């Protein structure tokens, strides 16, 4: 997936639109909601697809906090407690860093995709992501929260011999 951060109004996924709308209602005109305001009841239909990542030192690093079952299945394992820097040099995680950093620095909701996954073994998946800031102090992004829509993309058809 190329990192093309778009205005939030370009979301395709109804699930991601629902997560964004819940975030917007909860933010109620503030920079962002606090982490404790993002509850399972608020997101029940999207829980398998949500994730939350703590911002470390203003964006110098990020720590995986929670991920829904669909995210864990896609990623192949749980990453909770690990730092994003542990996976530096891997295309999928480097791309993730760019998206998280943009949200942290711009202090606004962003979306990426839809586009092909760069996760090894998951190249035939198309991803669309909504990335939303959370703030404990109302001024700085302290956690990044979001959801990911994962769709299977069939391999390209084989051309007939001689073409």
Residue ranges and their predicted role:
Residues 1-90, 94-163:
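Intrinsically disordered, low-complexity terminal regulatory regions
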